[in-house]
Amino acid sequence: MSDLQKPELKVSVISDYICPFCFIGHKRLESLRDHYDLKINWCFVEIHPDTPPLGHDVALLNYSEDTWNSLMQNLQQLASEENITLSPQTRVTNSRKALLLAEASKQLGADVFYPLHESLFNAYFVEGQNIGDEQVLRKLAADCNLPDELIEAAWSDPYTQGPEDKTPQALLPYLQYAGAIQATSVPTFIFNKEILSGVVSKDELRQAARNMTG
């Protein structure tokens, strides 16, 4: 069935590239394309703006080794359901530059945005790269055919480097939107008036889509 024959489905998603459940949620949401002309408004919100630009060791999260290993085991089980093989998570990174880059890429259309979108998730969670590192991001952007001038424009905001309590202008509307709908976690999926948060199953997403499209 072509997109012209499918019912249109507009969904907003509040998301961050350093959230593993956002990666899993992205994969699950994409499964709706089989039945809908899916239009997603990705709303990028930093979940850890206080993380230093180049990140820090996960030990600073103050989990015990047993607790951390249990969390990772459960996470890998969820990821494997979507054919994702996670690399060992040893560092937490700052996502601000990655989010700004993805936001800027939207102006070049879905054919540029989605390869970068996927690359950012894969780089961090599958390949274990630091997507807070500018050189890593430049390489990912180049591989997705983003021109240098767009990269520079994406990072031209005075708050690109921080401080943590100042949100760049390009991302501020999303933070305000999240506050307006009282979203307290990522991912949050907005199907018109129906809001789903956290680890949402494919069945729940399908039901929300049916509710929205009648």
Q: Which residues fall in each region the model found?
A:
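Functional transmembrane helices that embed catalytic/metal-coordinating motifs
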Residues: S15-Y17
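Cys/His/Pro-rich metal-binding microdomains
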Residues: P20
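Non-catalytic, low-structured ubiquitin/UBL-interacting segments
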Residues: M1
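Structural alpha/beta surface segment adjacent to cysteine/selenocysteine redox centers
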Residues: F23-G128
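C-terminal cap of thioredoxin/glutaredoxin-like
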Residues: L4-V13, I24-Y36, Q107-D111, P115, ...
